[in-house]
């Protein structure tokens, strides 16, 4: 534990922050690339019904990641505070609970999804034409649920021990396996939608195997050994108090996208298509910001647990400045090249024109989004469940829905486009107020 204490207590903060955050940013960008590669190979079949069928199944994937976050982020937030308090044995038990909790919920999800298959497919909007493909993709992903959900626990927890690079290697390994298997299963074996899903599941299995091996061989304070395992109700509560808000954030994102698409339907399909492209480009920027925000979480949690006010303050100051700087750079670069970015995906002039405007309006809220992300992360690290929950529900949920409704009435089409930026601004104001009030109460 000496090495670990050295890193978290002595290292200069910027160096330590980057050491923890860069691998997170990298893993997130890889997962995005691999989503795009998936889309590329599926589109390569030239079968629109198949492409649509797979797209309809993607919310299921988001749902699984959200569930994985309950144990992944909830467990690791608690573990980093315990490490700061030097309670290594307790941290080990929490890691065991999170690992098996994720397996159990994965099996439960698989069962529920299989039992209610036709009901869920209907809710997702599968039509007669797309049903067969959506169903194939859905079935494989549903059966792979335990493997997909479990992967998120070690990938988050290894960072609390300073193993950010190992966490990245595991995620990248899965993505690479998936990218190699995709064309083989979709085209060579001719499995189509089922092939794409199977490749995803096998990629996750490889990630799981690597993580379990690493935890057994290299990790001192995290474990997958179920022997002598016990956990109290208050400890389960501490994991869920942070894990559930984190998971709600993910679900809100899907809801936000769905609300925007529905609001745009009345303005024509080309607008919906343009927004689909803009969301993908915007996602790159958002993931970089999310990675830098969540990457520093083990450092914030550790210093909070260790009751080290000077170092906690320095960490937060650096986090806000770094995030703000990144947001401004992304706004400038993506905003300047907006039309060219949209053209990569579609060359239709009306889509390019609408898309460029949409992208610039989405980017307008980047700085505020950064403030919200760091604040949410600070609350998660400090075990402040309420603050984390309020912020995660607001930005793409409650505040966004209200802003969208009013903006649509007042300003029509342009109102819809500006909604996210307005919502980001309002949530950022809320974030600053909440963090300020919390910081005045921190008693060390």
Over which residues does each language-model region extend?
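Short alpha-helical transmembrane segments in multi-pass integral membrane proteins
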Residues: 1-21, 79-146, 188-244, 300-365, ...
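N-terminal transmembrane alpha-helices
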Residues: 9-40, 44-45, 59-74, 78, ...
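Transmembrane helical elements of multi-pass membrane transporters/channels
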Residues: 19-38, 140, 174, 203-207, ...
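Helix-terminus/linker motif at the lipid-water interface of multi-pass membrane proteins
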Residues: 29, 33-52, 121-128, 184-191, ...
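Interfacial/gating helices of multi-pass transporter permease domains
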Residues: 42-62, 128-133, 193-194, 235-242, ...
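Small-residue-rich hydrophobic transmembrane alpha-helices
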Residues: 51-111, 148-167, 261, 275-338, ...
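Hydrophobic transmembrane alpha-helices of multi-pass small-molecule transporters
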Residues: 63-66, 178-183, 208-212, 284-287, ...
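Short runs within selected transmembrane alpha-helices of multi-pass transporters and secretion channels
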Residues: 141-159, 167-175, 196-211, 290-293, ...
